[in-house]
């Protein structure tokens, strides 16, 4: 639990200035982050496993096909679009047995059996041709090594997790919550995005034809849209957009804001 709390707090602090709008929300999140940092760090130091500094790469066998990825517990996932499926774990030698990779019901689950702190690296490299859903939680981070293309893709980040992806997608759906962050680049025809509980989604460099955005509870969304834009912001959340959409429907209440950042 310690490393999860630390990752959550660090990510919230990193995105703090971007998404805090209301004074009440600001005070609440300050207190929450302080609690997470104090208890998270102490718990992590007591219960976590420290890396031995000897980094090795372990090639893992993939027993079954998968179309989804679910990663957690502070691990860093690097995804490469490739016709050749492969899986490698790059981490301190004494941490290798703690990092588990298992395919169940079409989902590749990547996690750790114990808290990890002070590691030289804890990377999991995944190569696959087709992925339609990516979930990251509990301080995990996912990166695309090259442009990832798909007809449809769902990205879900929660509990201080991060997603940094370069995409070409027909139907893209993204959801961020609980202090998570996303940074997206590329193109999408249809883009549905929602953020809550202090999460931050930056898609200024992702050009969407049509976009439906919903932000609440001190979260922040940035998008670029060219055709149809529907936006709703509530409870101190903010939505900023670029791209001069031809049709825009904007709704805001309880301290929420929807603003164009272009003249």
Regions found by a protein language model. Give the residues of each.
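Short, solvent-exposed coil/turn segments at beta-strand boundaries
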Residues: 104-106, 130-131
């Amino acid at each position: 639990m310690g490393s999860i709390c630390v990752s959550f707090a660090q990510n919230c602090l990193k995105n703090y200035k971007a998404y805090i709008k209301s004074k009440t929300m600001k005070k609440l999140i300050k207190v929450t982050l302080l609690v997470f940092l104090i208890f998270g760090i102490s718990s992590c130091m007591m219960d976590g496993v420290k890396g031995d500094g000897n980094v090795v790469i372990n090639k893992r066998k993939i027993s079954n096909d998968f179309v989804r990825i679910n990663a957690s517990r502070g691990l860093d996932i690097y995804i490469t679009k490739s016709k050749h499926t492969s899986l490698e774990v790059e981490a301190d030698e004494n941490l290798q047995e703690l990092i588990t990779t298992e395919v169940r019901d079409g989902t590749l689950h990547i996690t750790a059996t114990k808290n990890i702190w002070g590691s030289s690296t804890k990377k999991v490299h995944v190569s696959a041709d087709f992925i339609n859903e990516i979930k990251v939680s509990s301080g995990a981070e996912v990166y695309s090594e090259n442009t990832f293309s798909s007809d449809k893709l769902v990205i879900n980040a929660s509990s201080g997790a991060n997603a940094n992806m370069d995409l070409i997608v027909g139907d893209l759906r993204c959801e961020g919550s609980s202090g998570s962050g996303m940074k997206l680049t590329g193109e999408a025809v249809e883009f549905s995005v929602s953020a809550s509980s202090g999460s931050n989604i930056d898609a200024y460099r992702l050009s969407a034809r049509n976009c439906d955005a919903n932000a609440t509870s001190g979260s922040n969304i940035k998008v670029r849209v060219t055709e149809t834009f529907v936006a709703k912001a509530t409870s101190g959340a903010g939505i900023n957009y670029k791209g001069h959409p031809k049709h825009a429907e904007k709704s805001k209440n309880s301290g929420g804001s929807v603003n164009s950042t272009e003249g």
